[in-house]
Amino acid sequence: MTIIVTGAAGFIGSNIVKGLNERGETNIIAVDNLTRAEKFNNLVDCEIADYLDKTDFVARFARGDFGNVRAVFHEGACSDTMETDGRYMMENNYRYTLALLEACLEQGAQFLYASSAATYGASTMFREDRDYEKPLNVYGYSKFLFDQVVRRRLPSAHSQIVGFRYFNVYGPREFHKGRMASVAFHHFNQFRAEGTVKLFGEYNGYAPGTQSRDFVSVEDVVKVNLYFLDHPEKSGIFNLGTGRSQPFNDIAVSVVNALRESEGKPALSLDEMVQEGLVEYVKFPDALRGKYQCFTQSDVSRLRGAGYSDQFLTVQEGVSRYCKWLLERSA
């Protein structure tokens, strides 16, 4: 049976393709928009059966052109939270996804899609509940609105629908994301170029570098996606984070020590890094005041309740692995 991955040349999509390959799955149709041609690099070491542009895909899928489709992993979207073209965002993230959902329901294909923690916006509670969903930008709203459709459709759906609210994902194959790439990726490049990592200073009662996020490795994101592929009887909207919040200081320390280890140098503590100028704190930008979340932490109770029991990588574990991967490819 065929598996389809949209956004297949992107960050999470290409990691899902690779994860499927590692399970012996190669009958995969990759769907994407390669206007930014460099994204093809994410698929060079992957095995796929075919590639389609996103503009051609939904209509062909709805016609049944691909035969017996087991599942669709829908990772394709505009993920730039700074995008201000609301018409583009809603057409690309909401309307396109809605058409794909309808086709999956019609054909009985499993539908596993990327939602986002951006649906919570200004909330201080990160639980899959309408009361806590307060998106702050049109990206978050596009994801939020589709999640509401899913909630209405789930009671009558005869095939799986699963939405994953990704928190701060980092890991291999994100080179093309530019400013939207993870903090770990930016710290890696900054330290190699400048010999220091810069973090925000004190803000809103948080000491320098202690603003924190639920950072989740793309390795874990893939594992959760594949768990639900194996359990088509499980549907719903689930947070996909670690359930832990770790400070940006932890990312910086993990990156610096991974790079020091590659040079045969001993690990240092945060205080030692600050003393040696390897970690620096800069004034919190005025432009971000009042618009910046100092804390996120996913509530993973619903995910655990669905039977997913694997432990998530810590920042120290995941970032160290990621830096080694980056070093291997930049040698």
From Swiss-Prot:
Stored SUPFAM superfamilies: NAD(P)-binding Rossmann-fold domains
UniProt keyword annotations, A-Z: Carbohydrate metabolism, Isomerase, NADP
HAMAP family: Heptose_epimerase (MF_01601)
Active site location: Y139 (proton acceptor), K177 (proton acceptor)
Molecular function in Gene Ontology: ADP-glyceromanno-heptose 6-epimerase activity; NADP binding
Pathway as given in its UniProt record: Nucleotide-sugar biosynthesis; ADP-L-glycero-beta-D-manno-heptose biosynthesis; ADP-L-glycero-beta-D-manno-heptose from D-glycero-beta-D-manno-heptose 7-phosphate: step 4/4
UniProt note: domains: Contains a large N-terminal NADP-binding domain, and a smaller C-terminal substrate-binding domain.
Annotated protein name in UniProt: ADP-L-glycero-D-manno-heptose-6-epimerase
One Pfam family named in its UniProt record: Epimerase
Cofactor note (record): Binds 1 NADP(+) per subunit.
Reported cofactor(s): NADP(+)
NCBIfam families found in the cross-reference section: heptose_epim
Domain of life according to the entry: Bacteria
Upper classification of the organism: Bacteria, Pseudomonadati, Pseudomonadota, Betaproteobacteria, Burkholderiales
Enzyme's top EC category: isomerase
UniProt GO BP: ADP-L-glycero-beta-D-manno-heptose biosynthetic process; carbohydrate metabolic process
Protein family membership: Belongs to the NAD(P)-dependent epimerase/dehydratase family. HldD subfamily.
InterPro entries, sorted: Epimerase_deHydtase, Heptose_epim, NAD(P)-bd_dom_sf
EC number: 5.1.3.20
